[in-house]
């Protein structure tokens, strides 16, 4: 082996071909694995600190993300919060509304800058994915949300008769589009979030009968897959329901350890409760302690019951800011945010 590696002619030929490949295909097209043992992956905050922690910092930049779950589980809310975070940091975001169901009022309530949000409402799946591909290739857009995979109806299906049997059209469309999009994302740094619905497999008597729409290509191309579920309806006395408790399982993660769990509250009309997320992590890290129903900070009781503790922190933003900083430091997330980088040794 040493005789081969010390051959100067082979080393010279190797350097020549590596330089030629980089000239033809760009810097980083080929490299020695040891030169990039730790891959730098910038992240986009999700708007929920608990979810950021579960994903290893946030949504990875330049990657494909899939968020799937039942109806009214919080998929669109999470995506809109990510858009708001990108815009707050001065980035550009696009929303491809294949379902034609985007609510501008709700989006604005979540912090989305409606005036500067790029929105497309294409008539068919080919148009939607072509728009996404062109935005990715432009390298001028930081985040694209596609809502949803189930609504990406192929043109042939739209133009055909209602009774026509067309097998696998959408799966083939997704497979072809993802091949194009994935090849351009690494160079542009654009993140694409696909929202997806669940269906039931017919005739399944054992195992999980749930399956996502659009075939299997998205499962392979996605660096992160999030399974989001509504686990509780939030109620307050005579006021009735005011939100839901959502649980997210990181079903796949190529840039951080997978299978982590995150929970957070989604308040109707307001979105993710940031203070609620921070309180949960503060209790988890010991920044805030709970004995029975009482929550304490630095030895002083601040509230009885979780709702009152959240209210206290909302009414005392200075305390909330200090607690948030301590939580981030304890979780080693103090530098995480839009454009920041963390490291992974995951082999793609």
Swiss-Prot record:
Classification via InterPro entries: AAA+_ATPase, DNA_recomb/repair_RecA, DNA_recomb/repair_RecA_CS, P-loop_NTPase, RecA-like_C, RecA-like_N, RecA_ATP-bd, RecA_C_sf
Lineage of the species this protein comes from: Bacteria, Bacillati, Cyanobacteriota, Cyanophyceae, Oscillatoriophycideae
Entry's Gene Ontology molecular function annotations: ATP binding; ATP hydrolysis activity; ATP-dependent DNA damage sensor activity; damaged DNA binding; single-stranded DNA binding
SUPFAM superfamilies referenced in this protein's UniProt entry, alphabetically: P-loop containing nucleoside triphosphate hydrolases, RecA protein, C-terminal domain
Source organism, top-level taxon: Bacteria
UniProt-listed GO biological process terms: DNA recombination; DNA repair; SOS response
Function according to Swiss-Prot or TrEMBL: Can catalyze the hydrolysis of ATP in the presence of single-stranded DNA, the ATP-dependent uptake of single-stranded DNA by duplex DNA, and the ATP-dependent hybridization of homologous single-stranded DNAs. It interacts with LexA causing its activation and leading to its autocatalytic cleavage.
Keywords noted in UniProt: ATP-binding, Cytoplasm, DNA damage, DNA recombination, DNA repair, DNA-binding, Nucleotide-binding, SOS response
HAMAP family for this protein: RecA (MF_00268)
Binding site for ATP: 69-76
PANTHER family per record: MITOCHONDRIAL DNA REPAIR PROTEIN RECA HOMOLOG-RELATED (PTHR45900:SF1), RECA (PTHR45900)
UniProt subcellular location: Cytoplasm
GO CC, one annotated term: cytosol
Stored Gene3D superfamilies: P-loop containing nucleotide triphosphate hydrolases
Coiled-coil region: none
Family that this chain belongs to: Belongs to the RecA family.
PROSITE patterns linked to this entry: RECA_1, RECA_2, RECA_3
Protein name: Protein RecA
Source organism (scientific name): Picosynechococcus sp. (strain ATCC 27264 / PCC 7002 / PR-6)
SMART domains assigned: AAA (SM00382)
Predominant place of localization: cytoplasm
Entry keyword Nucleotide-binding: yes
């Amino acid at each position: 082996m040493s005789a081969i590696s010390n051959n100067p002619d082979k080393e010279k030929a190797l350097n020549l071909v590596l330089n030629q490949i980089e000239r033809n295909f760009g810097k980083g097209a080929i490299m020695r694995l040891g030169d990039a043992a730790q891959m730098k992956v910038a992240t986009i905050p999700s708007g929920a600190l608990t979810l950021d922690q579960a994903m290893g910092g946030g949504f990875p930049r330049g990657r494909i993300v899939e968020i799937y779950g039942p109806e009214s589980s919080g998929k669109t809310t999470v995506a809109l919060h990510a858009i708001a975070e990108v815009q707050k940091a001065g980035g550009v975001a696009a929303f491809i509304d294949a379902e034609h169901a985007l609510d501008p009022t709700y989006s604005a309530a979540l912090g989305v800058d409606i005036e500067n949000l790029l929105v497309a409402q294409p008539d068919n799946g080919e148009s939607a994915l072509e728009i996404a591909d062109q935005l990715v290739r432009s390298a001028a857009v930081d985040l694209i949300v596609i809502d949803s995979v189930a609504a990406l109806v192929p043109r042939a299906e739209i133009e055909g008769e209602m009774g026509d049997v067309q097998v696998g059209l959408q799966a083939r469309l997704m497979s072809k589009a993802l091949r194009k999009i994935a090849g351009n994302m690494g160079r542009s740094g654009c993140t694409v979030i696909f929202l997806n619905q669940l269906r039931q497999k017919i005739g399944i008597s054992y195992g999980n009968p749930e399956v996502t729409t659009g075939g299997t290509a998205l499962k392979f191309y996605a660096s992160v897959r999030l399974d989001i579920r509504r686990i509780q309806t939030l109620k307050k006395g005579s006021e009735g329901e005011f939100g839901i408790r959502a649980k997210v399982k990181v079903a796949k993660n190529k840039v951080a350890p997978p299978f982590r769990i995150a929970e957070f509250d989604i308040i109707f009309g307001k979105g993710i409760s940031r203070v609620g997320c921070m309180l949960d992590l503060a209790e988890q890290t010991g920044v805030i302690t709970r004995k029975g129903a009482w929550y304490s900070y630095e030895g002083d009781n601040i509230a009885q019951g979780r709702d009152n503790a959240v209210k206290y922190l909302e009414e005392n933003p200075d305390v909330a800011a200090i607690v948030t900083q301590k939580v981030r430091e304890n979780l080693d997330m103090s530098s995480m945010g839009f454009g920041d980088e963390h490291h992974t040794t995951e082999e793609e």
